[in-house]
């Protein structure tokens, strides 16, 4: 009900206007875009992908929730900047996809994942606190109930979301 606060959050998301210059903006959350070598999709590297996959999948959950709240009031942040938030969900989703036969397995290892971490597109990322030279395998395969937001949006709009769809189907 606070239109000033809502507008401030949307402007901050799009333009990084505010106190915390290193966080909150979509281009900081998704600093690099990569062509998916297996499809026509664009994958958006999450700023947390080099830290660990627990944080990367949390970013997907939080970004999806924020974009859905904005969408509910008529502001389509899923589509903003050529679907940058969707590209992030697809990147994180693809990297963390677990083979069907391994999905309910406790401890996951490299062979349990569909895609090899050594050949996965990644650009070294730095912020004021740290530098991540490679994509992290820590907590890879973290399961969070967030994929339905992205998949549902993309299905409604007729947009491809291969990896969000696979996660939504597995959940």
Task: List each language-model region with its residue ranges.
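Short, contiguous, pocket-lining structural segments
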Residues: 1, 5, 55-58
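CBM-like carbohydrate-recognition segments
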Residues: 77-171
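Generic structural signal for hydrophobic core residues of well-folded globular domains
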Residues: 1, 66-70, 96
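Active-site rim elements
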Residues: 46-54, 74-78
């Amino acid at each position: 009900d606070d239109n000033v606060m809502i507008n401030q959050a949307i402007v901050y998301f799009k333009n990084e206007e505010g106190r915390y210059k290193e966080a909150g903006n979509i281009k900081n959350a998704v600093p690099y875009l990569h062509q998916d070598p297996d499809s026509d999709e664009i994958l958006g590297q999450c700023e947390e992908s080099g830290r660990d996959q627990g944080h990367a999948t949390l970013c997907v959950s939080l970004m999806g929730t924020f974009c859905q709240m904005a969408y509910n009031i008529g502001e389509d942040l899923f589509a903003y900047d050529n679907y940058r938030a969707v590209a992030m969900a697809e990147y994180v989703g693809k990297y963390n996809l677990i083979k069907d036969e391994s999905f309910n397995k406790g401890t996951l290892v490299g062979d349990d994942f569909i895609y090899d971490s050594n050949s996965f597109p990644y650009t070294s990322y730095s912020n004021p606190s740290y530098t991540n030279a490679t994509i992290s395998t820590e907590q890879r395969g973290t399961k969070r109930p967030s994929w339905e937001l992205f998949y549902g949006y993309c299905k409604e709009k007729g947009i491809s979301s291969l990896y969000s769809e696979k996660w939504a189907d597995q959940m």
